[in-house]
Regions:
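Glycine-rich helix-loop-beta junction characteristic of Rossmann-like nucleotide cofactor-binding loops
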Residues: 76-78, 101-104
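A glycine-rich helix N-cap at a beta->alpha junction
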Residues: 126-137
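N-terminal glycine-rich, Lys/His-bearing helix-loop that initiates the first secondary-structure elements
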Residues: 1-56
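Glycine- and other small-residue-rich loops at beta-strand/loop junctions that grip anionic moieties
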Residues: 34, 88-89, 113-114, 137
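Conserved PLP-anchoring active-site segment centered on the Schiff-base-forming lysine
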Residues: 102-120
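Conserved N-terminal alpha-helix of the aminotransferase class I/II PLP-enzyme fold
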Residues: 36, 41-94, 119-127
Length: 137
């Protein structure tokens, strides 16, 4: 029997990844729409660039709003596994190219479906062939 005092999965997901000690105790984390973040001094900047703090530097790298969403999606998708993460990208091609670039090396061969998405086809058959010598079938 479920413990009536433990939160439901819906409640856990609604608040997963949110740190109530941040953002002045806001019940709902703010939406960060800025692209750049400031630092109090050079040591703070160095720590951020060395990734010791997980502080945002530039929105395409780390954004607090995006990071919370990634943590929620990872928790939903991975159940009890805590070693997996989710990444959000600004576009489908950003996601496709990130996965492909992570998975291949110069001179590799990629097998793709015949009717692959047009921009993906261009990325594979033009950019990767020219820049990395990757062949595509």
């Amino acid at each position: 029997m479920k413990d009536p005092h433990s939160p439901s999965v819906d409640t856990l997901m609604a608040h997963f990844g949110e740190d109530r000690t941040m953002y002045d105790g806001a019940v709902v984390p703010p939406v960060f729409q800025n692209s750049l973040f400031t630092f109090k001094d050079w040591d703070d900047i160095d720590a951020a660039f060395e990734d010791r703090t997980r502080r945002p530097i530039y929105t395409r790298l780390i954004n607090p709003t995006t990071r919370i969403a990634e943590q929620k999606i990872a928790a939903l998708a991975t159940a009890s596994r805590t070693d997996l993460e989710a990444r959000l990208t600004a576009s489908g091609m950003a996601a496709v190219s990130a996965v492909i670039l992570h998975s291949i090396c110069a001179g590799d061969h990629v097998v793709a479906v015949k009717n692959v998405y047009g921009p993906t086809n261009n990325f594979l058959n033009s950019y990767l062939r020219e820049k990395m010598g990757v062949e595509t079938t």
